[in-house]
Amino acid sequence: MSPIEPAASAIFGPRLGLARRYAEALAGPGVERGLVGPREVGRLWDRHLLNCAVIGELLERGDRVVDIGSGAGLPGVPLAIARPDLQVVLLEPLLRRTEFLREMVTDLGVAVEIVRGRAEESWVQDQLGGSDAAVSRAVAALDKLTKWSMPLIRPNGRMLAIKGERAHDEVREHRRVMIASGAVDVRVVTCGANYLRPPATVVFARRGKQIARGSARMASGGTA
């Protein structure tokens, strides 16, 4: 038995088979279509699927969750598999990625919504605003990410950004901009300590005030 299997069984439960099929899609068509690097195949479970799924510890039952810059479906798809009670929206601007997501979601039969667009676009904010949480992984620095996330979530909603070992440094660097963008209770937390070594590192923040219309669109650069 692989060291990953007990953790995967605990996290995905009876839907582990769906997680396996998703991993196969990432390792096959995902690599062939340039959505996953070939060197990532050997660590899909610990570094990608499980690392993403465990942030469900920070979500409430029935939450509407927007995955910003979903790419190949991370972290949104592992969350949707592990937590079928969640209402997961995969937000991704690139056509080739949304095509992959639609094919994969249809094959898996998981209940997720796919939206092709960017977080800073007004129509996206109109459609997805008021969500309970915005999640992301490897999308952008925290200053931009906060400006993109806050307009999509309700007051007191959560921003959950999966980060690496520099998470504390990044929070120190961007805290002022994050607060100016409406974030409160900004902190670094870990998830999955019972299953992963090391556990997933997440920058957690809440939306603490009303966001000025268009604040996200003033962020320089484009979103993934």
Swiss-Prot record:
InterPro entries membership: rRNA_ssu_MeTfrase_G, SAM-dependent_MTases_sf
Keywords assigned: Cytoplasm, Methyltransferase, rRNA processing, S-adenosyl-L-methionine, Transferase
Enzyme class: transferase
E.C. number(s) listed in UniProt: 2.1.1.-
Gene3D superfamilies recorded: Vaccinia Virus protein VP39
Pfam families: GidB (PF02527)
Subcellular location as annotated: Cytoplasm
Lineage: superkingdom: Bacteria
Entries under SUPFAM superfamilies matching the protein: S-adenosyl-L-methionine-dependent methyltransferases
Keyword Methyltransferase in record: yes
Disruption phenotype: Confers low-level streptomycin resistance. Seems to be an important cause of resistance in resistant M.tuberculosis isolates.
Family stated for the protein in its record: Belongs to the methyltransferase superfamily. RNA methyltransferase RsmG family.
PANTHER family per the UniProt record, alphabetical: S-ADENOSYL-L-METHIONINE-DEPENDENT METHYLTRANSFERASES SUPERFAMILY PROTEIN (PTHR31760:SF0)
Job description of the protein: Specifically methylates the N7 position of guanine in position 518 of 16S rRNA.
Protein name in UniProt: Ribosomal RNA small subunit methyltransferase G
